[in-house]
Amino acid sequence: MNARKTYILKLYVAGNTPNSMRALNTLREILESEFKGVYALKVIDVLKSPQLAEEDKILATPTLSKILPPPVRRIIGDLSDREKVLIGLDLLYDELSDNEMFYSSDK
């Protein structure tokens, strides 16, 4: 992982439902293990702040948005699969390419 990058994420949830809490707990585990010290996470309860959900065109929860670094990416629904979350947010590719795990066959 490139420590110079800062990841800005927003997690939209609907109250303290089991699905919302599971999404938050899973995401925190991923962020603390993979991106410790280089991320900011804002949790937005759409029941308490519906205007924020409307501004960002959030139609379902949980929704996770990666704001920075670009491009903006979103995952809607189940966040329990670590690898799918990282791939969906385009974070796993960055992590692998920063470690030079992709090889070119253009030799």
From Swiss-Prot:
The kiaA gene has been eliminated from Prochlorococcus during genome streamlining. It has been suggested that the central oscillator in Prochlorococcus does not have to be as robust as in other cyanobacteria because the former live in specific niches of the Earth's oceans; they divide exactly once a day and at the same time. Thus gene loss and changes in kaiB function compared to other cyanobacteria, can occur. May undergo a major conformational rearrangment; in the free state forms homooligomers. When bound to KaiC switches to a monomeric thioredoxin-fold (KaiB(fs)). The active oscillator complex is probably KaiC(6):KaiB(6). Keywords: Biological rhythms. PANTHER family: CIRCADIAN CLOCK PROTEIN KAIB2, KAIB-LIKE PROTEIN 1. CDD domains: KaiB_like. Belongs to the KaiB family. SUPFAM superfamilies: Thioredoxin-like. This is Circadian clock oscillator protein KaiB. InterPro entries: Circ_KaiB, KaiB-like, KaiB_domain, Thioredoxin-like_sf. Component of the KaiBC clock protein complex, which constitutes the main circadian regulator in cyanobacteria; it may modify the ATPase activity of KaiC. May be a metamorphic protein which reversibly switches between an inactive tetrameric fold and a rare, thioredoxin-like monomeric fold (KaiB(fs)). KaiB(fs) binds phospho-KaiC, and perhaps clock output effectors. It comes from the Bacteria. The keyword Membrane does not apply. Coiled coil: none annotated. One of its GO terms (biological process) is circadian rhythm. Signal peptide: none annotated. Pfam families: KaiB. Has 2 forms, fold switches to a thioredoxin-like fold (KaiB(fs)) when bound to KaiC. The gene is kaiB.
